[in-house]
């Protein structure tokens, strides 16, 4: 059901890395509750994500990166998410070059001077007032939902630059070493608990202007990746977490069904007509949603590689495919849990984890009902809300 990534892809980066073995380790540690109980992904796993290229995949080659396509990156996140949704979610922020590419080129050279494996975490909303000084901006405030912050090298926070109590220009993101921010461990959720999406607190940190940028501002870098719609990519890397988890749910049920009989003496689950029907239907819906998700990505990437700009309709299709896939994946995992019976209701049962994780994906603002409304606006030739495209 999954697109298999070859171990050979990582041989040039680190001969000791075996993606299959890493995923098995992640799965075992996640099922034992390690990441959920501590509310973050352990640092040794972050280091192994570096080794398989998660954080250099999208960095330009001139800075030591790999310049993968968006699809290649999403397929890797899908594979990791199949092992554990929280690890996949944290790894998805390897897409950070899409944001950081808006920094000045000289700043990027400084950022990657010791190598491209830089782990970024962000707390964007709400943008906090930041006083402009001759040296830069003074940043203070609290930001929520900073996924992966416990393992980050640098963090970015949303600011509204002020001078004489008046806002100056558009909101920006200020980037600083992670040790300049305090982490308050507030993340206690029903799903994706291991992402460690805690609060960032910053107290009067001076950030030079060259380390700030307008989020969503087009990058001045020439590589094709920086022509790809960054907000769409930010949505896709989260959606594909749900795709990976749903794939895991389907595979887990395929293994369970042939040997599981009812405690009341009924036939094995796999021999029940209703199970056969429901599983086939769920699998078809999943495969269709996943295929459309990747198809819309390929269409836009091919346009960019050919030197053309993607149309509003093509970009809107990517956003709509994300919302659709996220919801289908949540539906599929719930169906697998229902078919698995009473054993699937326990907290540490894999099916409970699958359901909780995919439902959290659907709660993200990028996958909200507004996406459907905006997609409808584009379909009718009308202007969508700012930030949709």
From Swiss-Prot:
Protein name, per record: Indole-3-acetate monooxygenase
Organism per entry: Acinetobacter baumannii (strain ATCC 19606 / DSM 30007 / JCM 6841 / CCUG 19606 / CIP 70.34 / NBRC 109757 / NCIMB 12457 / NCTC 12156 / 81)
NAD is among the record's keywords: yes
SUPFAM superfamilies (alphabetical): Acyl-CoA dehydrogenase C-terminal domain-like, Acyl-CoA dehydrogenase NM domain-like
Gene (UniProt): iacA
Induction data: Induced in the presence of IAA.
PANTHER family, per database record: MEDIUM-CHAIN SPECIFIC ACYL-COA DEHYDROGENASE, MITOCHONDRIAL-RELATED (PTHR48083), NRGC PROTEIN (PTHR48083:SF5)
GO BP: fatty acid beta-oxidation using acyl-CoA dehydrogenase
Lineage: Bacteria, Pseudomonadati, Pseudomonadota, Gammaproteobacteria, Moraxellales
Gene Ontology molecular functions: acyl-CoA dehydrogenase activity; flavin adenine dinucleotide binding; monooxygenase activity
InterPro entries the UniProt entry points to: Acyl-CoA_dehydrogenase, Acyl-CoA_DH_C, Acyl-CoA_Oxase/DH_mid-dom_sf, AcylCo_DH-like_C, AcylCoA_DH/ox_N, AcylCoA_DH/ox_N_sf, AcylCoA_DH/oxidase_NM_dom_sf
């Amino acid at each position: 059901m999954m697109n298999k990534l070859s171990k050979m892809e990582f041989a040039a980066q680190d001969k000791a890395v075996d993606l299959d073995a890493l995923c098995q380790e992640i799965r075992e540690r996640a099922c034992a509750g390690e990441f959920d109980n501590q509310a973050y992904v352990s640092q040794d796993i972050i280091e192994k994500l570096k080794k398989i290229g998660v954080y250099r995949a999208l960095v330009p080659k001139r800075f030591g990166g790999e310049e993968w396509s968006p699809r290649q990156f999403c397929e890797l996140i899908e594979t990791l998410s199949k092992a554990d949704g929280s690890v996949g979610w944290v790894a998805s922020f390897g897409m950070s070059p899409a944001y950081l590419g808006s920094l000045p080129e000289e700043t990027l050279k400084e950022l990657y001077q010791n190598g491209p494996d830089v782990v970024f975490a962000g707390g964007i909303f709400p943008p906090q007032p930041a006083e402009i000084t001759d040296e830069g901006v003074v940043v203070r405030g609290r930001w929520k939902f900073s996924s992966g912050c416990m393992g980050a090298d640098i963090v970015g926070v949303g600011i509204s630059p002020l001078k004489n109590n008046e806002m100056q220009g558009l909101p920006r993101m200020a980037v600083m070493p992670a040790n300049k921010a305090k982490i308050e461990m507030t993340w206690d959720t029903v799903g994706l608990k291991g992402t460690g999406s805690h609060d960032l607190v910053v107290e009067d940190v001076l950030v030079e202007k060259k380390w700030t940028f307008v989020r969503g501002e087009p990058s001045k870098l020439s590589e094709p990746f920086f022509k790809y719609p960054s907000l769409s990519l930010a949505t896709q890397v989260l959606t594909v977490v749900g795709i990976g988890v749903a794939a895991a749910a389907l595979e887990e049920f395929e293994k369970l069904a042939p040997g599981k009989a009812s405690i009341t003496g009924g036939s094995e689950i796999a021999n029940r007509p209703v199970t056969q029907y429901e599983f086939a239907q769920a699998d078809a819906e999943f495969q269709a949603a996943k295929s459309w998700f990747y198809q819309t990505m390929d269409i836009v990437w091919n346009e960019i590689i050919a030197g053309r700009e993607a149309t509003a309709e093509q970009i809107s299709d990517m956003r709509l495919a994300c919302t659709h896939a996220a919801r289908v994946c949540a539906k599929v995992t719930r169906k697998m849990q229902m078919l698995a019976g009473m054993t699937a209701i326990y907290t540490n049962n894999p099916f409970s984890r699958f359901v909780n994780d995919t439902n959290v994906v659907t709660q993200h603002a990028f996958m909200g009902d507004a996406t459907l409304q905006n997609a409808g606006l584009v379909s009718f030739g009308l202007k969508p809300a700012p930030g949709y495209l």
